Amino acid sequence: WSLTPERFEQYLKTAFDCWHQDAMRGKKRYHRYFDNLLLMLNGQPPEACGMLGTCGMQYVVEADGSVYPCDFYMLDQYKLGNLNTDTLAQIDARRKEIGFIEQSCAVDEKCKICKWYQLCRGGCRRDRDYYQDGIGRNYYCAAYERFFEYAWPKLGEVYEEVIRG
């Protein structure tokens, strides 16, 4: 990993502070992660797939027609087929066969009892996949925990500001 959890935490806090300050001045800027947290606070699903808690059904198509289940999994072992030679039904059958989405539903036991799980939801599969044998806790778990502790009160302030709009 080139980005350590400590550096990621530092980035989250620094970017959040800038985002929060702008929002409190009435000049809220869009930041995908933070704005998705606002959606979640408002009872809506996040639009970012890495914040859903499970992988969604999507396909990435390369120029040569190769199809993969995610842009982070464009590896031979996850290749679902090729649009030049396979039907969509065959490609979808392969997705089901490898269980790509189903595997992403696995939740670590520690995650189930974490007070931030409803915001974190385990994060993107790619950050859980290679960290442990199989899909376990997110590599950046500690960074997210400390970020949520830090940002939670201010996130509520931005939420109230946006709702009053």
Predicted regions and their residues:
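Flexible mid-to-C-terminal extensions adjoining Fe-S/redox cofactors in radical SAM and related proteins
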Residues: 74-165
